[in-house]
Amino acid sequence: MKLKLFLLSVLLLVSGSSQAQRIKDIANVQGVRSNQLIGYGLVVGLPGTGEKTTYTEQTFKTMLKNFGINLPDNLRPKIKNVAVVAVHAEMPAFIKPGQTLDVTVSSLGEAKSLRGGTLLQTFLKGVDGNVYAIAQGSMVVSGFSAEGLDGSKVIQNTPTVGRIPNGGIVERTVTTPFSTGDHLTFNLRRADFSTAKRLADAINELLGPGMARPLDAASVQVSAPRDVSQRVSFLATLENIQVEPASESAKVIVNSRTGTIVVGREVRLLPAAVTHGGLTVTIAEATQVSQPNPLAGGQTVVTADTTIDVAEEDSRMFLFNPGTTLDELVRAVNLVGAAPSDVLAILEALKMAGALHGELIII
C-alpha cells in the first residue's frame, strides 16, 4: 500500500520591505520590568475535596498556633476541607502600595478540587525573600471534578488551579533605576546590530549628535535629564520615535511535530536537483497450527506464517535554478505532493549539500 501524500501548508514571511515601528514596540527600558512573587498558604472551606497529608496537618497546626490555639503534638486533626497551595503573582513595574494584583492559586498536594475554597492570608515574597504583597480571598475555579461510588470519574479543565482577581494587596514597591543615574538604556527585544545602530541614529537625529550610542546588538544608551520630573516626558517622546528594524536573517523554521514550516523572505537556494521517493515495507505475521496424523506419534506445533510486501512510490525530480526564491521553492515542493516529514528530509538534505542559504531550525 502506497503512502498517501498530503498537501503541505507552508506559512510564508513575505512582507515587502520592513516597516517603521515605534521604539516602544521593539525595545524595553532597562530596569522597567515586572517581578515574580510566590507564597505558601492554606485554602479552607472545600466541600470534602481537600487532603490529609502530613505537611497539610503541620501547616494547619502552625496556623492555629499563630491564633493562640495550641494542639497536642500527638493529635492529628481530621481535616478534609483544607488544602496547601502555592500562590504566585506578577508584580508590574511602578505599582504602588495599596494597589491590587491578580493571584493564581495551585494545589501542592493531593486535593481533588479547589472549587468553593477560600485562600487565607498568604505572604507573597520576591526573590530577595522580602514580602511585597499579601493575598487572600475566594477563588474562581473554572474546572470541576465528580466521582461516583463505583470509581467512575469526570474531570473538566483543571479543578486544582484557581485565580483570585485583585486578591493581592501590594505592601512594598520595588525600586528601579529609572529615576537614578545620568542615562537610560533601551534593550531590543530581538538583538540586531543594524537595528541598534538605526535606533541610536533616530534618537540622535531628534535630540542631537552624541545623545545616544549603541552598546551592543541589544542595548542603546541614551543621556537622560537628571531632573526626575523631566524623565517621564523625555521617555514619552523617545518611545514614539519611528525606527525601521533591520531585515531578519534568512531562516527556515520547522516544527517536526505539527508539520508547520515557516520560511523567511531572505531564504535562497543554489542550483540543486532533488528527487525524493518513499519505500513502504509491510510485514504481516500470522500463526498456524500444524496437527500431525493421529497415528504418526508426532506433536502439535505452532508455526509462523510471515508475509512481507514492499511498495515503492514513483518519484519525480525537480530542479532549483540559481537564486530560487521561496515562492518557487514552495511551488516545487507542493508540485511533488510531499508530506511534512518528506519536506523536512528535503530541507535537511539541501542544507547538508550547501544549497540552502539560510539557517534551518527544527523545533
UniProtKB/Swiss-Prot annotation:
Signal peptide stretch: 1-20
Pfam family for this entry, one: FlgI
Predominant subcellular localization, coarse grouping: periplasm
Entry keywords, A to Z: Bacterial flagellum, Periplasm, Signal
Subcellular location: Periplasm; Bacterial flagellum basal body
GO molecular function terms noted in the UniProt entry: structural molecule activity
A GO cellular-component term linked to this record: outer membrane-bounded periplasmic space
Keyword Oxidoreductase: no
GO biological process: bacterial-type flagellum-dependent cell motility
Protein family per UniProt: Belongs to the FlgI family.
PANTHER family: FLAGELLAR P-RING PERIPLASMIC PROTEIN FLGI, FLAGELLAR P-RING PROTEIN
Record-linked NCBIfam families: PRK05303.1
Subunit structure comment from the entry: The basal body constitutes a major portion of the flagellar organelle and consists of four rings (L,P,S, and M) mounted on a central rod.
Function: Assembles around the rod to form the L-ring and probably protects the motor/basal body from shearing forces during rotation.
Protein name per its UniProtKB record: Flagellar P-ring protein
